[in-house]
Amino acid sequence: MLKQVFNQEGLVRRKWRWFFLLVLAAYVLAIVLMCFTPQPNLFKGIQTPHVIAVGRLRFLVVPLNSLWSLPQLSTPLELSWVIGQNVMNVFLLYPLVFMIHCLWKNWHSSSKSLWLGFRISLIIELTQLLLDVLIDANRVFELDDLWTNSLGALLAFYSYRWLHHRLSRCL
């Protein structure tokens, strides 16, 4: 089955390319909805320590805030929220970057993947700030999101590299 989808370079074959591009576009839309939809009071009762409010803007600029804040979390809900949010941030860009590797070979390096993940993450965070200025979307600029999203992009590269290695032995 993989031989039908991928060529010897590990890229998606021409007849599957449209499908991967469609899935990629759908996933970009999902990211837009997840990251830019306003969240007015959706998470009452869940407090993230060290959030700084400047007018309508909210910032969380403490590096590794989740680790330093664990003792301050008082309920299982808060603990699961913080851990779950970090895990989800690692995997937010993973499918996107993995599909990019399957479609275009010019991203095939760990440094390019890491840089791509960081730039996409920074664009997301800055756009959330802009949305807070324009429509009070109740979003938080989180420094940890930058490194967790970038880590997900790096994991996508290594997953792709593993798949490419497996494919090269099969093809």
List where the protein language model places each region.
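Non-cytosolic membrane-interface motifs at loop->transmembrane helix junctions
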Residues: 137-146
